[in-house]
Amino acid sequence: MSVPPLLSLAGVSVSFGSPADGHEVLSEISFDVPDGEFLCIVGPSGCGKTTLVRLLAGLLAPSGGQILFQGRPLAGTSRDRAIVFQDYSKALLPWRTVAGNIALSLEACGIAEPERSERIGALLAKMRLEPAAARFPSQLSGGMQQRVQIARSLAQQPKLLLMDEPFGALDAITRQDLQDEIARLVAENRTTVVFITHDLEEAIYLGDRVIVLAAEPGRIAEMIEVGIPRPRDQLETREDRRFLEHRHRLFGLLQGH
Amino acid sequence: MKRVLRGALIPALVFLLWEAGSRADLLPMDTLSRPSDIAVALAGGFVDGSILLATWQTVQAALSGFAIAAAAGILVGAILGLSPPIERTVGPSIEALRPIPAVALTPLTLLLFGFGLRMEAGVVAFACVWPILLVTVAAVRGIEPRLLEVAQILRLGFAARLRKIILPAALGRIVVGLRVALSISLIVAVTVEILMNPRGLGYGMIIASQSLKPDLMYAQLLWLGFLGWGLNAALTRAFGSWHGAFGPGVRP
């Protein structure tokens, strides 16, 4: 008697355009995500990564196959599945402060004062945003804005956290900070994560498991268990024998051609 | 303060030359009253209350019409902006109605409402609704799609989406339509008064002109200009502080 996976995809495909001459973006995608896993999906541009994350969020319906979430067919969006977009500046409400942006999730979840303020305070502390609470997104650096978006996503207490290339637009140092931060938060909350990236090293560094997608049409090329113990370290993990082996093995798959 | 003084330089100079010109009999007194006579007429109008009453009547009609147009324009505009199928159905009718000159509806509103506030406000509302409606449709369509996806992920209902996402995101551009409409409202109100509605500053000016009192006519004209400037300044001020909600240096 095994526990059913939190998320399960079976033969999922997505085509745009008419059935006859439609363009197939994703083809025959099947994988399970057990509760508590950190799954990274890496692939070259044009492999349908973003389409996949939109499917999982419920913003898009598959053309074929089935997606089960908690054992039930996934239909439409749900507050159980949060999403962190890459373009943080477009995803935050510019007319609300940092605290106000986090409050949006809590308002949507129907959480009233004084609990709302308490939870905002806890999230601000957790994401190290306390000094910025009363500031507007436009007054913050990219890294800080992305922290706000992550805080807003965590505020809805999702069972599944979807992250669509969340650190793709950040500089290398900020990216490493946020990688460690998200790994710590996820370990604390035991949140299940599907993390999309085009950065192979980021995928191996963060993931329990890495799925490599191939392009045209987007399909699963390879799936590996990372098997490096946590907590991981930006220096040592990246020099770990297993890290380098994975990197060597998967590198060729991402070259396209 | 220095800027205000600098800006007042040219009008002061014009009035000074005007006064001097008419005292030297260089200007025709029957059409160009002396500024000093105009000032006396204006003061007289304030003292006997006639200008204040006329101002109240004009502003009341302009603002009532404007308020009706703003409510209808923003609501309908938001619906049309959110739903392309509805827009495709209603859009052609709007395009058919919009070119009708608002003032041409004066005889119709007279039949409907008779002389008075309601006919004037009706014409003003018809004139003001279009810029607000069109700007709102464009503003709602121009909202960052990401924000609508955030609303979808959080499963906000229609009312919450409108209040928390759509209106705040679109308001910066809707304000542009409101400002255009506000200046139109005063123009149309005065025009309707000059055409046929026996109330307000427009009617007052016609009466002054027909009874050969150019000083009183000029007094009301100047007062009307000041009124338009004041209305616009009030609106800029009201929404200037609202813009501030975006933080410094950010304009939606």
How would you label these PLM feature ranges?
Chain A
Residues 96-107:
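Q-loop/switch helix immediately C-terminal to the Walker
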Residues 155-159:
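A short, proline-enriched helix->beta-strand linker immediately N-terminal to the Walker B motif
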Residues 42-44:
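The feature captures the beta-strand-to-loop junction immediately N-terminal to the Walker
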Residues 57:
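Helix-to-loop junction immediately C-terminal to a conserved catalytic motif
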